[in-house]
Curated annotation (Swiss-Prot):
Family the entry assigns: Belongs to the universal ribosomal protein uL5 family.
Molecular function (Gene Ontology), one example: structural constituent of ribosome
InterPro entries the UniProt entry points to: Ribosomal_uL5 (IPR002132), Ribosomal_uL5_bac-type (IPR020930), Ribosomal_uL5_C (IPR031309), Ribosomal_uL5_CS (IPR020929), Ribosomal_uL5_dom_sf (IPR022803), Ribosomal_uL5_N (IPR031310)
Keywords: Ribonucleoprotein, Ribosomal protein, RNA-binding, rRNA-binding, tRNA-binding
Function recorded in the entry: This is one of the proteins that bind and probably mediate the attachment of the 5S RNA into the large ribosomal subunit, where it forms part of the central protuberance. In the 70S ribosome it contacts protein S13 of the 30S subunit (bridge B1b), connecting the 2 subunits; this bridge is implicated in subunit movement. Contacts the P site tRNA; the 5S rRNA and some of its associated proteins might help stabilize positioning of ribosome-bound tRNAs.
GO biological process, alphabetically ordered: translation
Species name: Cupriavidus pinatubonensis (strain JMP 134 / LMG 1197)
Lineage of source species: Bacteria, Pseudomonadati, Pseudomonadota, Betaproteobacteria, Burkholderiales
Stored HAMAP family: Ribosomal_uL5_B (MF_01333_B)
Quaternary structure and partners: Part of the 50S ribosomal subunit; part of the 5S rRNA/L5/L18/L25 subcomplex. Contacts the 5S rRNA and the P site tRNA. Forms a bridge to the 30S subunit in the 70S ribosome.
GO cellular component term of the entry, any: ribosome
Pfam family, one: Ribosomal_L5
Protein name as it appears in the record: Large ribosomal subunit protein uL5
PROSITE patterns (UniProt xref): RIBOSOMAL_L5 (PS00358)
Length: 180
């Protein structure tokens, strides 16, 4: 069974974008290819449990086991050696991606304190969107009593859109709450 947003994309979003931008083929319509969740954990150089807890949190949020990212180069100023674990990331595609996007837009974003919408300026010029989340507790899968620290994460939404205008229209069609 396809995810709810996947059906919504095929039935509602594609015709709307074809009408708005005048695409000749259905394959021209921009689509979301992947969503990457990244958690940078610079403080993990002192305590290995931080990495384990962050991996557990990301697993609950994404429904998929993340990869522990390691330092590419040694940086003496940050007391980091090459190969030290300094973060965790997970890439979502297909059905899991649509299910995460659905939960993120309908459940997690409204739980952010003082939420007035996401910035419409976080596009990179090539149709990809980045959003930073300050606390992982906005996701309902994370139990507030069982976390050791509040950690933020970066969410990158990669699309096939050629420019920011097309990408904003695509995410707007998915009911993304842009503030401007």
């Amino acid at each position: 069974m396809a995810a709810r947003l996947q059906e919504f994309y095929k039935e509602k979003v594609v015709p709307k974008l074809i009408e708005q931008f005048g695409y000749k083929s259905v394959m021209e319509v921009p689509r979301i290819t992947k969503i990457t969740l990244n958690m940078g954990l610079g403080e993990a150089i002192n305590d290995k449990k931080i990495i384990e807890n962050a991996v557990g949190d990301l697993t609950k949020i994404a429904g998929q086991k993340p990869v522990v990212t390691k330092a590419k180069k040694a940086i003496a100023g940050f007391k980091i050696r090459q190969g030290y674990p300094i973060g965790a990331m997970v890439t979502l595609r297909g059905e899991r991606m649509f299910e995460f996007l659905d939960r993120f837009v309908t459940v997690a974003l409204p739980r952010v304190r003082d939420f007035r919408g996401v910035s419409g300026r976080s596009f990179d010029g090539r149709g990809n969107y980045n959003i930073g989340v300050k606390e992982q507790i906005i996701f309902p899968e994370i139990e507030y009593d069982k976390i050791d620290a509040l950690r933020g994460l970066n969410i990158s939404i990669t699309t096939t859109a050629k420019n920011d205008e097309e990408a904003k229209a695509l995410l707007g069609a998915f009911k993304f709450p842009f503030r401007n």
